[in-house]
């Protein structure tokens, strides 16, 4: 190995280190004893033939440490990083085994002290270079963690890799203080601590979860756990908060629910305070007849809701008297209505049968005539208008108006009767019976004025045609005089006004 650094002055500090570490012959163990050598070839120490001032031979390990310190690197940091500084802490090294043991112990102490310092690749490379071997590999230079120089050191030193890793790493982990051991994220202790922390946080959140009890169960629990079996409202609140941490928050919400449960359940009875027990608020206790509402003392499930008979009777009395009287008389009233409807239905069937026997042909003929008249309305529209105007011009205004109004009502009744004959009577009676409890019809009610009658469903033009057709029939009974020009003086406005006047008040255009 060629000379890379200048010769040290005689009064240098590493001389004492070299002299203290030289425990063996220069060929095998003198300079390499401090570095844990003795099992391999000696380091090339013949490049330093000049002895120091006190007679000790300066090994390349000590020289490299000196030169690195003289280059401006901090002494404390290099002593903690460089493994050769371990030889300064051992006063007498007898053999290589003792040197390895002392080196591992001092190395672990120095490395635990240098945990706070930042280690980079150049410092690790300098430590490897100071050992005198060709260990400047990219792997050793690239590693910046604490354990990487220890792992690479076994291949560079004289010991075998297996023995060095077994001795050095076990000594390092064994001699590390507890603080540095817990700082490692991958150590078993940190994993165990995280496993211990997780159940504690889960248990903490589990205690703050909502308990699976109803408000009635909580109130019953509080009352039954009291020796006097009586509690005020504030004492019930306090018992629930002491037992379940969940109810220590959002107090206004669940306390309202507690008050509602006390008021609306018959199993809780309010007892006023006596003079011997002064204080604020009444007592709440369980109803003596409520018994054991929960199965086998388990508050998770209630058997059946308790109802006090006296309170239930009071509730029934507080209901509306009209409603209760209607409910009480509704069965007899319903039977009376049913019998009345059955009687009416029987008579309607008899009347219908007799009507078909006597005048069946006439009704059928009337229906046919009506249908034929509807089919011919479009063709005879002009004639109807002429006849209507003739009727209005020949007679006074109020007479045909009154006469036509009476005839229109008669026509509506006939039409409704014909529709009733065509429909099944049971359907009509069922319809009226179903509508009877809901709506009471006025006294002058006729089926023709129903909103769903045929007159309401017909368009406005068809209704006007029917009216004019009826007027033309009545106009035929007058003197059959020819058409005059008097209807021209009447005008179209009076015609539409007469139609609007004749229209019944209930008709609406769809």
UniProtKB/Swiss-Prot annotation:
Residues 47-60 have a biased composition (Low complexity). Residues 1-62, 175-205, 309-359 are annotated as: Disordered. Gene3D superfamilies: Winged helix-like DNA-binding domain superfamily/Winged helix DNA-binding domain. PROSITE patterns: FORK_HEAD_1, FORK_HEAD_2, FORK_HEAD_3. It holds the Pfam family Forkhead_N. The keyword Transcription applies. GO terms for molecular function: DNA-binding transcription factor activity, RNA polymerase II-specific; protein domain specific binding; RNA polymerase II cis-regulatory region sequence-specific DNA binding; RNA polymerase II transcription regulatory region sequence-specific DNA binding. The lineage of its organism: Eukaryota, Metazoa, Ecdysozoa, Arthropoda, Hexapoda. Residues 20-39 have a biased composition (Gly residues). It is found in: Nucleus. Residues 341-356 have a biased composition (Basic residues). Transmembrane segments: none annotated. This is Protein fork head. GO terms for cellular component: nucleus. Fkh promotes terminal as opposed to segmental development. In the absence of fkh, this developmental switch does not occur. The nuclear localization of the fkh protein suggest that fkh regulates the transcription of other, subordinate, genes. It comes from the Eukaryota. One of its GO terms (biological process) is positive regulation of transcription by RNA polymerase II. Residues 209-300 bind DNA. Keywords: Developmental protein, DNA-binding, Nucleus, Phosphoprotein, Transcription, Transcription regulation. CDD domains: FH_dFKH (cd20041). The modification Phosphoserine is found at residues 187, 190, 320, 322, 330. InterPro entries: FH-like_dFKH, Fork-head_N, Fork_head_dom, FOX_domain-containing, TF_fork_head_CS_1, TF_fork_head_CS_2, WH-like_DNA-bd_sf, WH_DNA-bd_sf. The keyword Transferase does not apply.
């Amino acid at each position: 190995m060629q000379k890379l650094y200048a010769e040290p002055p005689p009064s240098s500090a590493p001389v004492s280190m070299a002299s203290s570490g030289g425990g063996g012959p220069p060929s095998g163990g003198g300079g390499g004893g401090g570095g844990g050598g003795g099992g391999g070839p000696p380091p090339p120490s013949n490049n330093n033939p000049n002895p120091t001032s006190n007679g000790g031979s300066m090994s390349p390990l000590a020289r490299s440490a000196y030169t690195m310190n003289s280059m401006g690197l901090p002494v404390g940091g290099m002593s903690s990083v460089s493994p050769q500084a371990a030889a300064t802490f051992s006063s007498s090294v007898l053999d290589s085994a003792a040197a390895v043991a002392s080196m591992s112990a001092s190395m672990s102490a120095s490395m635990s002290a240098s945990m706070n310092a930042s280690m980079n690749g150049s410092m690790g490379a300098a430590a490897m270079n100071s050992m005198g071997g060709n260990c400047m590999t990219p792997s050793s230079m690239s590693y910046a963690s604490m354990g990487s120089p220890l792992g690479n050191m076994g291949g560079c030193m004289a010991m075998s890799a297996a023995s060095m890793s077994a001795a050095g790493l076990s000594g390092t982990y064994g001699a590390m203080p507890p603080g540095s051991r817990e700082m490692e994220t991958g150590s078993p202790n940190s994993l165990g601590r995280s496993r211990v922390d997780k159940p504690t946080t889960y248990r903490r959140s589990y205690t703050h979860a909502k308990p699976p009890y109803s408000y009635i169960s909580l109130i019953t629990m509080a009352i039954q756990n009291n020796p006097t079996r009586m509690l005020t409202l504030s004492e019930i609140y306090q018992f629930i908060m002491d037992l379940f941490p969940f109810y220590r928050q959002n107090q206004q919400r669940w306390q309202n629910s507690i008050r509602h449960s006390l008021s609306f359940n018959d199993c809780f009875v309010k007892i006023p305070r006596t003079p011997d027990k002064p204080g604020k608020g009444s007592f709440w206790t369980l109803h003596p007849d409520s018994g054991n509402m929960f199965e086998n003392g388990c508050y998770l499930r209630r058997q059946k809701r308790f109802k006090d008979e006296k309170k239930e009777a009071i509730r029934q009395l507080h209901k509306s008297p009209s409603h209760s009287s209607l409910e009480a008389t509704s069965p007899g009233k319903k039977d009376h209505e049913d019998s009345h409807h059955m009687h009416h239905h029987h008579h309607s069937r008899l009347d219908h049968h007799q009507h078909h026997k006597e005048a069946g042909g006439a009704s059928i003929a009337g229906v046919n005539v009506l249908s034929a008249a509807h089919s011919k309305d479009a063709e005879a529209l002009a004639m109807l208008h002429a006849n209507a105007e003739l009727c209005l011009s020949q007679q006074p205004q109020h007479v045909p108006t009154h006469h036509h109004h009476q005839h229109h009502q008669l026509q509506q009744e006939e039409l409704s009767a014909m529709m009733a004959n065509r429909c099944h009577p049971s359907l009509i009676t069922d319809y009226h019976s179903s509508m009877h409890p809901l709506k009471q019809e006025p006294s002058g009610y006729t089926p023709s004025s129903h909103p769903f009658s045929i007159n309401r469903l017909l368009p406005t033009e068809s209704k006007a045609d029917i009216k004019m057709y009826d007027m033309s029939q009545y106009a035929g009974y007058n003197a059959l005089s020819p058409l005059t020009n008097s209807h021209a003086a009447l005008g179209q406005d009076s015609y539409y006004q007469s139609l609007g006047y004749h229209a019944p008040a209930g008709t609406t255009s769809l």
